[in-house]
């Protein structure tokens, strides 16, 4: 009977491990070069209205790369431009809106909105975004650019109601960026399909790691109880 | 095997939305709203009216009319603000429905969510179990009819706006729902 109880415990460990390791499903956005990605990331107004938020890229097997962050004071609505990235932060509506303009095929990859509060782990908002940018064929359409504003070499940091004094978070850009407004394109994102893929490799790895550590604890406890009562 | 298939088919059929009390039945004033909601919707916002409760079809129909009257005639809105209202008689009352944008939360959330309100004030008590069941049935039928994404998320009104709604006790209940996400 004790053996059955112990196997039951093992089952519980396995189940709890898989539950804990379930990550957010990716949301896939399929866009064409030149289009704009728009992602709306809600956050909990009670917990995170006053927290810093960020848009990050997740390169394969590397540390997340923070691309743009909201600027202080976080309690006021603000808009931050960093090259092709725009963050619109509305703390009273509990929404962070991310835009990536003039998409290129090289922008394809995995991204995420987070609550950015080091040294704590970032809190992922919405879902990880799987962006897939393909080359548009010439006979489909070309974006209507009305007008193009050529910007200077220096990065732009625009915040409303606040003059930025902290410029250490800006990055210098190697080439001028253009703000492209393409009103004729209408909808700028295609909602991800329901059948989105979970990153199974990361789930598997975390499940296995957790299982190994829990099995180790289980084995030690088993030996100790056997010694005490055996 | 055949029995399992039949059972599964029945389950699919079971989630129709015909239990919703339509506007004509609770004698709603006509809607003057025109902004539509795109489907499927990703978010559901749960609120309470913080007003009177009701626990019978007659009193809940009256209460729904009262709320609509307040929104249309006092606040000047095109219709009752909510997409659906839940009475403690255990019924769902059709407000703006699945297709029309509500005015229940704020300018960012209204076009991207379904607003469901519980008629009453739920700071100090939980709604009747039948009311909670009705809300969950509504959400299930919404998914099966394609109005809600299968991975829709439930938010409390206070999660996305500065408000006490849906009340401490109701808020605690919805936090235990499967689709709740803070």
UniProtKB/Swiss-Prot annotation, chain A:
According to the UniProt topology, which residue ranges lie Cytoplasmic? 224-230
SMART domains, per database record: IG
Taken from the record's topology, the Extracellular segments are 21-202
Location (main, coarse)? membrane
The knockout note for this entry states: Deletion mutants do not show any influence of the antiviral T-cell response. However, TREM1 deficiency impairs secretion of CCL2 and TNF-alpha by neutrophils in response to viruses. TREM-1/3-deficient animals have decreased neutrophils in the airway and these neutrophils have a defect in transepithelial migration.
Write the protein's name.
Answer: Triggering receptor expressed on myeloid cells 1
Q: Give the record's keywords alphabetically.
A: Adaptive immunity, Cell membrane, Disulfide bond, Glycoprotein, Immunity, Immunoglobulin domain, Innate immunity, Membrane, Receptor, Signal, Transmembrane, Transmembrane helix
Biological process (GO) annotations?
A: adaptive immune response; innate immune response; neutrophil chemotaxis; neutrophil extravasation; neutrophil migration; neutrophil-mediated killing of gram-negative bacterium
Question: Do the record's keywords include Membrane?
Answer: yes
UniProt source species: Mus musculus
Q: Which residues are glycosylated?
A: 191
Annotated TM spans: 203-223
Q: Which residues form the Ig-like V-type domain?
A: 21-124
Q: How does it assemble?
A: Monomer. Homomultimer; when activated. Interacts with TYROBP/DAP12. Interacts with TLR4.
Question: Which Pfam family, any one of them, does this sequence belong to?
Answer: V-set
GO CC annotation terms, alphabetical = plasma membrane
Q: Where is the secretion signal located?
A: 1-20
Curated annotation (Swiss-Prot), chain B:
Gene3D superfamilies, alphabetized? Peptidoglycan recognition protein-like (3.40.80.10)
Coiled-coil regions listed: none
Please name every pair of cysteines joined by a disulfide bond in this record. Answer: 17-141, 33-78, 54-60
Q: Which GO terms describe its cellular component?
A: cytoplasm; extracellular space
Name the Gene Ontology molecular function terms of this record: cytokine activity; Hsp70 protein binding; molecular adaptor activity; N-acetylmuramoyl-L-alanine amidase activity; peptidoglycan binding; peptidoglycan immune receptor activity; zinc ion binding
Q: Which family does it belong to?
A: Belongs to the N-acetylmuramoyl-L-alanine amidase 2 family.
User: What keywords are assigned to this protein?
Assistant: Antibiotic, Antimicrobial, Apoptosis, Cytokine, Cytoplasm, Disulfide bond, Immunity, Innate immunity, Secreted, Signal
What biological function has been recorded for the protein in this entry? Innate immunity protein that plays several important functions in antimicrobial and antitumor defense systems. Acts as a pattern receptor that binds to murein peptidoglycans (PGN) of Gram-positive bacteria and thus provides bactericidal activity. Forms an equimolar complex with heat shock protein HSPA1A and induces programmed cell death through apoptosis and necroptosis in tumor cell lines by activating the TNFR1 receptor on the target cell membrane. In addition, acts in complex with the Ca(2+)-binding protein S100A4 as a chemoattractant able to induce lymphocyte movement.
Concerning InterPro entries, the annotation shows:
Amidase/PGRP_sf, Amidase_domain, Peptidoglycan_recognition, PGRP, PGRP_domain_met/bac
Q: In which tissues is it expressed?
A: Strongly expressed in spleen and lung. Also detected in brain and thymus. In the lung, expressed in the intraalveolar space, in the brain, expressed in the Purkinje cells of the cerebellum and in certain layers of neurons in the hippocampus. Also detected in cells filling the space within the intestinal villus.
Secretion signal span: 1-18
Q: What is the designated name of this protein?
A: Peptidoglycan recognition protein 1
Q: Which residues form the N-acetylmuramoyl-L-alanine amidase domain?
A: 39-167
**Keyword S-adenosyl-L-methionine assigned:** no
Task: Tell me, in one coarse class, where this protein mainly resides.
Answer: cytoplasm
Q: Where in the cell is it found?
A: Cytoplasm; Secreted
- Can the keyword Cytoplasm be found in this entry's annotation? yes
Assembly and partners?
A: Homodimer; disulfide-linked. Interacts with HSPA1A; this interaction forms a cytotoxic complex that is released by lymphokine-activated killer cells. Interacts with HSPBP1; this interaction blocks the cytotoxic activity of the PGLYRP1-HSPA1A complex.
**Gene Ontology biological process terms, A to Z:** antimicrobial humoral immune response mediated by antimicrobial peptide; apoptotic process; biological process involved in interaction with host; defense response to Gram-positive bacterium; detection of bacterium; innate immune response; killing of cells of another organism; negative regulation of inflammatory response
